[in-house]
């Protein structure tokens, strides 16, 4: 073998035998640091860059439910696009004023002279539906998102003050990643 090849092989072996400096140890993560302002942001960026892929994130509740649902699926089940065979015997037609659902049966007028109260009921029912549609999804959604962003903002402000005045571990800062 040539001397150059042996030296290159030795150099390559020495590089591989060196411990990786990019590895994150538990001691490094548990070390308490005091950082304020820009140093706090830089520390978060450094910690997030160093810990990418280090620890698997905890399983979320949604994934657990998906796994539970998939375990109940039968492989020999029929596809959902087929309709079950219904009996060919036609059902007896109900009179037009006769309610078929139990929810409708509780609002049936007692006598024929109470038709006015039925009309009042219909008007009030449609009015309450309109009110329910007025406070619909976009307003509630923005309210929900506002509370989430507010919680995240307060949490990050609290963490920055804690890291500045009392100190915090790098592991606690990984929650911001």
Swiss-Prot record:
Q: Which residues form the propeptide?
A: 64-149
Ranges in a coiled coil = none
Q: Which CDD domains match?
A: IlGF_relaxin_like
Q: Which GO terms describe its cellular component?
A: extracellular region
Q: Does the keyword Cytoplasm apply?
A: no
Segments spanning the bilayer are none
Instruction: Output the Gene Ontology terms for molecular function.
Output: hormone activity
* Keywords for this protein: Cleavage on pair of basic residues, Disulfide bond, Hormone, Secreted, Signal
Please list the disulfide bridges.
Answer: 36-164, 48-177, 163-168
Q: What does the record give as the function of this protein? A: Relaxin is an ovarian hormone that acts with estrogen to produce dilatation of the birth canal in many mammals. It bears mature young, and allows separation of the pelvic bones.
Similarity field? Belongs to the insulin family.
Cite the record's note on assembly: Heterodimer of a B chain and an A chain linked by two disulfide bonds.
Q: What is this protein called?
A: Prorelaxin
Q: Species name for this entry?
A: Mesocricetus auratus
Name of the gene encoding the protein in the UniProt record? RLN
């Amino acid at each position: 073998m040539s001397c150059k090849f042996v030296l290159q092989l030795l150099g390559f072996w020495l590089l591989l035998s060196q411990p990786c400096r990019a590895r994150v140890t538990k001691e490094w993560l548990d070390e308490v640091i005091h950082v304020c302002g820009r140093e706090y942001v830089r520390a978060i960026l450094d910690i997030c860059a160093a810990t990418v892929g280090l620890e698997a994130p905890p399983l979320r509740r949604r994934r657990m439910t998906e796994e539970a649902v998939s375990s109940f699926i039968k492989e020999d089940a029929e596809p959902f696009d087929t309709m079950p065979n219904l009996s060919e015997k036609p059902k007896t037609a109900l009179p037009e004023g006769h309610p078929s659902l139990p929810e409708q049966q509780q609002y049936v007028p007692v006598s024929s002279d109470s038709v006015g109260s039925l009309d009042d009921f219909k008007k009030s029912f449609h009015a309450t539906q309109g009110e329910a549609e007025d406070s619909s999804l976009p307003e509630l959604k923005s309210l929900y998102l506002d509370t989430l962003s507010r919680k995240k903002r307060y949490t990050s402000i609290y963490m920055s003050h804690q890291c500045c005045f009392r100190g915090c571990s790098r592991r606690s800062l990984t929650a911001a990643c």
